[in-house]
Design a protein with these regions (language model features):
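Short solvent-exposed coil/turn linkers within tandem alpha-helical repeat scaffolds
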Residues: 27-33, 64-70, 99-109
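Acidic, proline-/serine-/threonine-rich low-complexity intrinsically disordered segments
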Residues: 1-11
Protein backbone atom coordinates (compact mmCIF):
# COMPACT_ATOMS: atom_id res chain seq x y z
CA UNK A 1 0.00 0.00 0.00
CA UNK A 2 2.88 2.38 0.85
CA UNK A 3 4.54 1.82 -2.53
CA UNK A 4 1.19 2.33 -4.25
CA UNK A 5 0.93 5.71 -2.52
CA UNK A 6 4.44 6.68 -3.55
CA UNK A 7 3.79 5.69 -7.16
CA UNK A 8 0.56 7.70 -7.21
CA UNK A 9 2.34 10.73 -5.72
CA UNK A 10 5.10 10.56 -8.33
CA UNK A 11 2.38 10.40 -11.01
CA UNK A 12 0.83 13.60 -9.58
CA UNK A 13 -2.24 11.65 -8.44
CA UNK A 14 -2.32 13.31 -5.04
CA UNK A 15 -5.82 12.27 -3.94
CA UNK A 16 -5.07 8.64 -4.79
CA UNK A 17 -1.72 8.87 -2.99
CA UNK A 18 -3.36 10.46 0.06
CA UNK A 19 -5.85 7.61 0.23
CA UNK A 20 -3.09 4.98 -0.01
CA UNK A 21 -0.93 6.60 2.69
CA UNK A 22 -3.97 6.98 4.96
CA UNK A 23 -4.78 3.29 4.53
CA UNK A 24 -1.18 2.38 5.26
CA UNK A 25 -1.16 4.43 8.49
CA UNK A 26 -4.43 2.91 9.72
CA UNK A 27 -2.71 -0.47 9.93
CA UNK A 28 0.94 0.53 10.45
CA UNK A 29 1.15 3.48 12.87
CA UNK A 30 4.37 2.21 14.43
CA UNK A 31 5.98 0.69 11.34
CA UNK A 32 9.37 2.01 10.19
CA UNK A 33 7.74 3.75 7.21
CA UNK A 34 4.98 5.39 9.28
CA UNK A 35 6.81 8.74 9.61
CA UNK A 36 7.38 8.76 5.86
CA UNK A 37 3.73 7.94 5.14
CA UNK A 38 2.61 10.78 7.45
CA UNK A 39 5.05 13.16 5.71
CA UNK A 40 3.72 12.15 2.29
CA UNK A 41 0.18 12.89 3.48
CA UNK A 42 1.38 16.42 4.13
CA UNK A 43 3.04 16.57 0.74
CA UNK A 44 -0.16 15.45 -1.00
CA UNK A 45 -2.06 18.25 0.70
CA UNK A 46 0.69 20.79 -0.04
CA UNK A 47 0.63 19.91 -3.74
CA UNK A 48 -3.13 20.45 -3.76
CA UNK A 49 -2.58 23.89 -2.17
CA UNK A 50 -4.27 22.75 1.05
CA UNK A 51 -1.58 24.51 3.06
CA UNK A 52 -3.40 24.68 6.41
CA UNK A 53 -4.11 20.94 6.33
CA UNK A 54 -0.57 20.20 5.18
CA UNK A 55 0.79 22.14 8.17
CA UNK A 56 -1.28 19.92 10.48
CA UNK A 57 0.03 16.73 8.86
CA UNK A 58 3.62 17.96 9.08
CA UNK A 59 3.02 18.76 12.76
CA UNK A 60 1.95 15.15 13.34
CA UNK A 61 5.27 13.98 11.87
CA UNK A 62 7.17 16.31 14.21
CA UNK A 63 5.09 15.44 17.29
CA UNK A 64 4.71 11.69 16.75
CA UNK A 65 8.10 10.91 15.20
CA UNK A 66 10.54 13.62 16.40
CA UNK A 67 13.59 11.40 15.94
CA UNK A 68 12.68 10.25 12.43
CA UNK A 69 14.54 11.44 9.37
CA UNK A 70 11.32 13.13 8.22
CA UNK A 71 10.89 15.42 11.25
CA UNK A 72 13.28 18.11 10.03
CA UNK A 73 11.86 17.86 6.50
CA UNK A 74 8.36 18.28 7.94
CA UNK A 75 9.45 21.41 9.82
CA UNK A 76 10.95 22.85 6.66
CA UNK A 77 7.80 22.13 4.69
CA UNK A 78 5.74 23.73 7.46
CA UNK A 79 7.79 26.87 6.98
CA UNK A 80 7.15 26.77 3.24
CA UNK A 81 3.43 26.29 3.81
CA UNK A 82 3.30 29.28 6.16
CA UNK A 83 5.08 31.33 3.48
CA UNK A 84 2.44 30.26 0.94
CA UNK A 85 -0.19 31.54 3.38
CA UNK A 86 1.71 34.87 3.61
CA UNK A 87 2.45 34.20 7.28
CA UNK A 88 6.09 35.23 7.08
CA UNK A 89 6.63 35.77 10.81
CA UNK A 90 5.35 32.28 11.58
CA UNK A 91 7.52 30.85 8.80
CA UNK A 92 10.57 32.51 10.40
CA UNK A 93 9.71 30.94 13.76
CA UNK A 94 9.42 27.52 12.14
CA UNK A 95 12.71 27.86 10.24
CA UNK A 96 14.48 29.01 13.42
CA UNK A 97 13.03 26.02 15.29
CA UNK A 98 14.43 23.74 12.60
CA UNK A 99 17.88 25.31 13.05
CA UNK A 100 17.66 24.91 16.83
CA UNK A 101 16.16 21.42 17.00
CA UNK A 102 17.85 19.79 13.99
CA UNK A 103 21.18 21.64 13.51
CA UNK A 104 22.74 18.76 11.59
CA UNK A 105 19.82 18.10 9.24
CA UNK A 106 20.07 18.45 5.49
CA UNK A 107 17.37 21.16 5.59
CA UNK A 108 19.52 23.60 7.60
CA UNK A 109 21.06 25.32 4.59
CA UNK A 110 17.68 25.70 2.87
CA UNK A 111 16.12 27.09 6.07
CA UNK A 112 18.96 29.62 6.40
CA UNK A 113 18.38 30.75 2.80
CA UNK A 114 14.65 31.15 3.43
CA UNK A 115 15.32 33.16 6.59
CA UNK A 116 17.62 35.52 4.66
CA UNK A 117 14.98 35.91 1.94
CA UNK A 118 12.31 36.75 4.52
CA UNK A 119 14.25 39.61 6.17
Amino acid sequence: VYNKGLAAYKANKYKEAYSAFSSYLEKNRTAPLAPNARFWLGECLFQQKEFELAILEYQKVIADYPKSNKASAALYKQGEAFEKLSEKDTAKIVYNKLLADYPKSEQVEMAQKRLKALK
